[in-house]
Every structure is written in structure tokens, then in C-alpha cells.
């Protein structure tokens, strides 16, 4: 079982909504979903986004009745200036394996991966490998995968690819995004 998490803010930015979708990776069936919302109590500071988003994600995780093997977060793991993005932050707090899968690069340099699905190249920062730039669909922009907590980069890449069917973003990511959007609308 795998859980994917996503967040969204109210239009005025005062409330944060989080969603966790637990799926069976063998058939992508939804096992459980939870949502949470709370007042935003930390200002926007670049590089410290997890202090704004992680509390709501933890609230959603704590509502789960199932116990997923791994949590994937829409955001960075160690591919972060402080090597502690939201996926790492949440992993430390829940003491579970976490993976960061982001739509955009926060830091680092890379050579563009090949155009075929599954192609990937290292994401580097100051000589350190901090993640992989992974093509999840042929001829489509890549995603940025990094270790969050208690997992290997190879496992993170495999999990993200396994969950990617017909779109750029892995299917559980799309489900979590839809769920948090519904929670935001009330």
C-alpha cells in the first residue's frame, strides 16, 4: 500500500487543505482517503514551505485507518537547499518511508534525460546527488524525484514509475490533487 499526499491553500491563503490517498499499487484501487484542514500559522518563507504545509499533511495521515508502506509527497525530499524538503520533514515526523516527487526543480543542475519513459539523470548540487530527473512519459516534461526518509533513490524511482500510467504525473498524485481540490471547495 502506498499513500500520496497533496496540499492546497484557500483563495485568501489563510486555510490549508491536505489530502492523503491510500492505494493498492497492484491495481491502483483506492483503499482509503482522508482530508484535513487548518488555519495557516506560519508565514511564507522561501525554503521553509514544509512548516506551512506539513502540519495539515500530518493531520490527514493521522486520520488514516490503514498503515501504508510508503508515503509520497508532492514536493521535495532532500532535493532542497537544507536537504530537508517537505517529504523529508513529514518522514521524520511520522517515522515512515517517504519520497518527494515534484513537478518543478527547486535546486540543482542536471542533463536532460532521454525522451523515453523511464529515462532519468542525476539531479546534482555542489557535487552531491540529491535526486533524479525522471521522464514518466515519452516526450513529456520530467518530474523531480528525491529521497524523503527511510528509502533509497532507486526504490523512489521504481515506485514513481510503477504508479505512472498514462499521464506525466503518477496516478495517485492526480487522485490526491483532485481530492484536495474537492476539500478546498467544501
Residue ranges of each PLM-predicted region?
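A glycine-rich, hydrophobic loop/mini-helix early in the fold
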Residues: 13-67
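Short acidic, Gly/Ser-rich segments with clustered Asp/Glu that frequently serve as metal-coordination loops
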Residues: 7-13
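Flexible, glycine/proline-enriched loop segments at strand-loop-helix junctions
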Residues: 44-47, 74, 80-81, 140-147
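C-terminal binding/interaction regions
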Residues: 1-5, 54, 59-61, 65, ...
Amino acid at each position: 500500500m502506498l499513500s500520496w499526499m497533496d496540499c492546497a491553500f484557500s483563495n485568501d491563503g489563510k486555510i490549508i487543505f491536505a489530502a492523503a490517498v491510500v492505494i493498492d499499487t497492484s491495481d491502483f484501487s483506492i483503499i482509503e482517503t482522508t482530508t484535513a484542514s487548518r488555519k495557516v500559522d506560519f508565514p511564507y518563507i522561501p525554503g521553509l514551505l514544509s512548516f506551512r504545509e506539513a502540519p495539515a499533511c500530518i493531520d490527514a495521515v493521522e486520520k488514516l485507518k490503514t498503515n501504508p508502506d510508503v508515503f509520497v509527497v508532492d514536493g521535495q525530499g532532500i532535493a532542497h537547499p537544507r536537504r530537508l524538503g517537505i517529504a523529508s520533514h513529514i518522514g521524520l515526523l511520522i517515522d515512515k518511508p517517504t519520497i518527494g516527487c515534484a513537478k518543478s526543480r527547486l535546486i540543482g543542475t542536471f542533463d536532460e534525460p532521454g525522451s523515453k519513459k523511464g529515462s532519468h539523470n542525476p539531479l546534482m548540487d555542489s557535487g552531491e546527488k540529491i535526486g533524479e530527473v525522471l521522464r514518466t512519459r515519452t516526450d513529456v516534461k520530467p518530474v523531480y524525484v528525491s529521497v524523503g526518509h527511510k528509502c533509497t533513490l532507486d526504490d523512489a524511482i521504481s515506485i514513481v514509475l510503477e504508479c505512472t500510467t498514462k499521464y506525466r504525473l503518477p496516478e495517485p498524485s492526480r487522485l490526491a490533487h483532485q481530492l484536495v481540490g474537492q476539500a478546498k471547495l467544501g
